[in-house]
Amino acid sequence: MKAYWYDNIPGDQRLPHDSGRTVDASYLATIGVLYRHCPAISAVDDLARDRGYKNRDEIIISPEKMGDVYEDKVRMFFNEHLHEDEEIRYIVDGEGFFDVRSKDDEWVRIRLGKGDLIVLPAGIYHRFTTDENNYVKAMRLFQDEPKWTPLNRAPELDANQHRKTYVESHISSSTA
């Protein structure tokens, strides 16, 4: 895992966009993002048991696996959105980037590779993309039935209860 401030330079979203300013895991924790390196699946199983994740599946994001819909899917994943549930991803193979909003609404880019696990809290604005190799195999973990429902960022979404709870827990409490 490598986290840093996104450079905001226009261009291919799959490039690193590394500003050279690093972000450490302790900052990620303050915005509710949990990171773990899990070299063995047993560590993922332990975390799943401890956090009550009952279901899982795997997804391969690549042109070979997804065919003609690959580019559209990657663009869709890169639209800024939130979920009303935690988003848990364990990288089985390949690499990708999660971008998450900071306390000041700036992008923090998190590069994940094989063995990296990330938990994004419900209500955090984020987006995802593969890197320039266009391949990632990820395990998705779920507390209940598998679902992935993105709510794209819009002004009215700030009234969403999951967003409000996130802001109260991770943004407002740290600036008071």
Curated annotation (Swiss-Prot):
Binds either 1 Fe or Ni cation per monomer. Iron-binding promotes an acireductone dioxygenase reaction producing 2-keto-4-methylthiobutyrate, while nickel-binding promotes an acireductone dioxygenase reaction producing 3-(methylsulfanyl)propanoate. Its EC number is 1.13.11.54, 1.13.11.53. Pfam families: ARD. GO terms for cellular component: cytoplasm; nucleus. Ni(2+) binds at residues 81, 83, 87, 126. GO terms for biological process: L-methionine salvage from methylthioadenosine. One of its GO terms (molecular function) is nickel cation binding. This is Acireductone dioxygenase. It comes from the Eukaryota. Its cofactor is Fe(2+); Ni(2+). Fe(2+) binds at residues 81, 83, 87, 126. Pathway: Amino-acid biosynthesis; L-methionine biosynthesis via salvage pathway; L-methionine from S-methyl-5-thio-alpha-D-ribose 1-phosphate: step 5/6. It is found in: Cytoplasm; Nucleus. Its main location: cytoplasm. Keywords: Amino-acid biosynthesis, Cytoplasm, Dioxygenase, Iron, Metal-binding, Methionine biosynthesis, Nickel, Nucleus, Oxidoreductase. HAMAP family: Salvage_MtnD_euk (MF_03154).
